[in-house]
Regions:
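Feature captures the catalytic ectodomains and active-site-proximal regions of enzymes
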Residues: 1-438
Length: 438
């Protein structure tokens, strides 16, 4: 069996932009190594989860690793908790959370929260400059100072402004059938999706429609709202945030919750499902949690270097680690972050850095007669909309036994002319494994 390098470039896809003469950041970026792979292989385009679904990364990663998220997904919170090493038992409620900046506001109708006073969101990510050290210190302060009525919690900062929250009630199990307090994300059934339009204010958590009479959902919403109020009081008074404000920075004074889950999914291992023994290189807790639940090996790789240094080190480690596995799942966060900020120039530079500092050294040392390289994205992240979209993402598969299909560049438009055609996310892995087996 030929070795598999399955590389996911987070948020790579995008919309054509007027500022780029109708092209996307990927189409503008100088990517000679990705273009070479595309020219030597087969290309196609992928709807990762479904038409009309702007997926969050968790459900998209499920899909592109070959697992139907409609069947297996139980919420992003449990996945991130597993990735962060926090236990989630059945009946606990685990959330993915963001540190955010808010201001108190008085409301009088017209709000999604009615007349109840609440919080206007100033920045959902604290200006993206909350250090991991600050976030960990704030989380520890909340853990020490917040006391809940007949309940307990575990709050842990993970990377930057991100974290996880696990709530546990002494009065009975909690249900995940509750709304997000983060207005940027909604639900389609059990799946978390990015919303195009929303009020920029914290949402009071309530049971999802149809679950208003469920005691577990009512208990979960009440407990979440209690925790949000009490944690705000601690964070807003924190000396860490006072210091940030004195430095002209935004305070991380609120925690936005989303994508709760009340149990961890039970998955058939990747090896049992598809055959290959896979290892992974990932940056974020959600991908780490998914990989662990699928039984993948975790390659210890640095995530705290400057991007170019990290890409070069990852390429070096991938060439070493592949000797112990049939394939590697490599997830690179780079392009997603500037797209959320609406910065198409930074997204272009990120893509170019990945091409020059990850793919260049990888391909220089890789024998493509004995290996396959597949490159795609988990979702599109639109610079214009600053959010995930349901837009298809390009896919290339190049290497051993793969003939060229006449496509000579890697990009959203070119991929539509490729021999692979239009695939759904869960179709990628069976095709890739089949090609690897020759």
């Amino acid at each position: 069996m030929n070795k598999i390098f399955y590389v996911i470039l987070d948020g790579l896809g995008d919309d054509p932009l007027d500022a780029l003469d109708g092209r996307t950041p990927l189409e503008v970026a100088r990517t000679p190594h990705l273009d070479r792979l595309a020219a030597q292989g087969r290309n196609g385009y992928v709807t990762t989860v479904g038409e009309g679904i702007a997926p969050e990364s968790d459900i998209a990663v499920f899909a592109i690793l070959g697992y139907d998220p409609h069947e297996h997904h139980t919420g992003r919170g449990p996945l991130e908790s597993v990735g962060a090493g926090v236990e989630v038992n059945d009946g606990d409620l685990a959330y993915r959370v963001n540190f955010a900046t808010v201001e108190r506001e008085a409301r009088s109708g017209g709000s999604q929260n009615g007349d109840q006073d609440g919080w206007a969101i100033v920045d959902r990510r604290v200006g993206r400059d909350l250090s991991s050290e600050e976030a960990h210190a704030l989380a520890e302060e909340v853990q020490r100072k917040v006391a809940l009525d007949k309940a307990s919690f575990e709050f842990k900062a993970t990377v930057g402004h991100r974290g996880i929250l696990v709530l546990r009630s002494d009065e009975g199990p909690l249900s995940a059938e509750v709304e997000n307090s983060d207005p940027d994300y909604g639900r389609q059934g059990s799946l978390g999706v990015a919303l195009e339009t929303f009020d920029n204010e914290v949402v009071t958590v309530t049971p999802v429609t149809g679950n208003e009479d469920d005691p577990a959902a009512e208990r979960a919403s009440d407990l979440t709202n209690e925790w949000l109020r009490k944690s705000f009081e601690v964070l807003d008074a924190s000396e860490i945030n006072a210091k940030r404000k004195g430095e002209g920075k935004l305070p991380g004074n609120f925690i936005l919750t989303r994508d709760g889950g009340d149990h961890v999914p039970k998955l058939v291992s990747f090896k049992e499902k598809f055959g290959p023994e896979m290892g992974c290189f990932v940056e974020m807790p959600v991908e780490l949690g998914i990989a662990r639940l699928m039984g993948m090996g975790v390659v210890e790789a640095p995530t705290d270097l400057r991007p170019r240094e990290q890409y070069e080190r990852w390429a070096e480690l991938a060439l070493e680690a592949i000797e112990g596995y049939d394939g590697l799942y490599i997830h690179i966060k780079g392009p997603d972050v500037p797209a959320h900020d609406g910065d198409h120039d930074a997204k272009i530079h990120s893509i170019e850095d990945i091409d020059a500092h990850f793919f260049a050294p990888l391909l220089d040392s890789l024998d493509l007669r004995r290996a396959l390289v597949a490159v795609t994205a988990d979702h599109s992240t639109s610079c214009a909309r600053k959010s995930h979209t349901d837009g298809p993402v390009p896919l290339l598969i190049s290497g051993a036994g793969v003939s060229a299909d006449g496509v000579d560049t890697y990009g959203e438009t070119a991929s539509r002319n490729g021999a692979l055609g239009h695939l759904m996310g869960p179709q990628i892995m069976p095709n890739l494994v089949k090609l690897a087996r020759g």
